[in-house]
Amino acid sequence: GLDLKACFQYLDLLRRLMRRGTSVVLVTHHIHEIPPEVTRVVLLKKGRVVADGKKEDVMTGETLSALFGTRIHLVRSNGYYQALPGRKQV
């Protein structure tokens, strides 16, 4: 993992490349590293595609909970996503 400063520099570089029209294939387990400019997301589990489509359609708490096998509460802010522990149903 990168420290926060290095992570922000990395994201800034990715965003600049994408704004210039460069295609970027990003492979990560860290959803907070997905830049706002990303339009398509492919989710894999054990080498198989479990979801593929527009970022806003694929990046849901329900989809990520199924993918990672744990409840996830997904938060979106300024085009970025963050996974938080999901709440148990009462």
How would you label these PLM feature ranges?
Residues 42:
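Conserved catalytic/dimer-interface elements of ABC ATPase nucleotide-binding domains
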Residues 28-29:
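H-loop/switch region of ABC-family ATPase nucleotide-binding domains
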Residues 52-53:
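ABC ATPase "signature
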